[in-house]
Amino acid sequence: PKATGIIVTDLMYKHWDEWVTTAPHPFVADFDGNAISNIVDILNGEPYESPMKPWGGIEQLAWNTTSDKVAYTCRKKTGLEYAISTNSDIYVYDLNTKKTENITEENKGYDTNPQYSPDGKYIAWQSMERDGYEADLNRLFIMNLETGEKRFVSKAFESNVDAFVWGADAKVIYFTGVWHGEVQIYALNLTDNSVRAITEGMYDYGVPALFGDKLIAKRHSISMGDEIYAISLDGKTTQLTQENKEIYDQLEMGKVEGRWMKTTDGKDMLTWVIYPPQFDPNKKYPTLLFCEGGPQSPVSQFWSYRWNFQIMAANDYIIVAPNRRGLPGFGVEWNEQISGDYGGQCMNCLLYTSPSPR
């Protein structure tokens, strides 16, 4: 029988679940309300991706406030150099002059996800410092578009800045970030670079959007999938969707608690413990030890469709999920300790620091 195949002569040949055969490009066009015209490929004739595969989306592109410039994320490399490098940059394409400017050329790690401020005076983006290090600290930078001055504004937050959105007055940026096993929404004051937590509790928040004097964001936890919430800037939350209420009303979830315990080298480590729905402290239960992969990804209040703790607990297991060494949310040193020590202290955290359920 006939067979097909792919001959690979260079990298990058595959991203997770897809072969690399095409490169997405950003286009701009005129729109009169009915149809588009004057279509322009910003990367015409170039072999580069924007948005970048495999995860990039529309968040890697941004219009300026006067709609005559487009900022985009791109790693302008090919072959082996592309495969091993994280050196992407923020480029600004001028629709009038057709010229492109690299505004992050001096930084050698990831630069991604540009956003212009509402007043048109600044541009913000996420930035990692080191080339080839995908788990580097994800920092927030802003640049004054008139002077070119750049500032690392999230220095007070010793963890990754995830999704972010400008405040209406361009004096505050709201962002999500993981800290101590929870992903909360924070307010970054650009006057003094101070950071204030807006939300709290055993939840993970995601993709905040500004709507008047409130934020709209999704929220989930170990015990509930995503729902949409309105968040006042003082932290008050209002649930807007109840997509799965009828299902949840029929279920009994297990108790979730966080415990701090000492590691073998004397550090404090947060561990999530999830109990069976009808836990009896007088009974003995088998325990499942959850070993987070990545390796540098957090054990937060995530709701997983693959590793769902509540489904495990519903089968009469106690789940132990340590935030072992080598993941974000506990400072840079904690996250980076695993580099060069994979199988060392992180395994000690998993195997020799197990709590006894009370």
Task: Give the ranges of each region predicted by the language model.
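Short loop/turn segments that connect beta-strands within beta-propeller blades
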Residues: 31-34, 94-98, 145-148, 189-193, ...
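Catalytic nucleophile-loop/oxyanion-hole region of alpha/beta-hydrolase
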Residues: 331-348
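Conserved alpha/beta-hydrolase
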Residues: 316-329
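Blade-terminus and WD-like Trp-Asp/Gly-His loop motifs, strongest in beta-propeller folds
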Residues: 61-69, 114-122, 164-172, 208-213
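Non-catalytic accessory segments flanking enzyme active sites
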Residues: 3-8, 12-42, 59, 69-71, ...
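A flexible loop/linker signature enriched in serine peptidases of the S9 family
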Residues: 1-25, 45-57, 73-89, 102-112, ...
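Conserved small/polar residues in nucleotide/adenosyl-binding loops
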Residues: 352-358
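Short beta-strand element of the alpha/beta-hydrolase
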Residues: 283-293
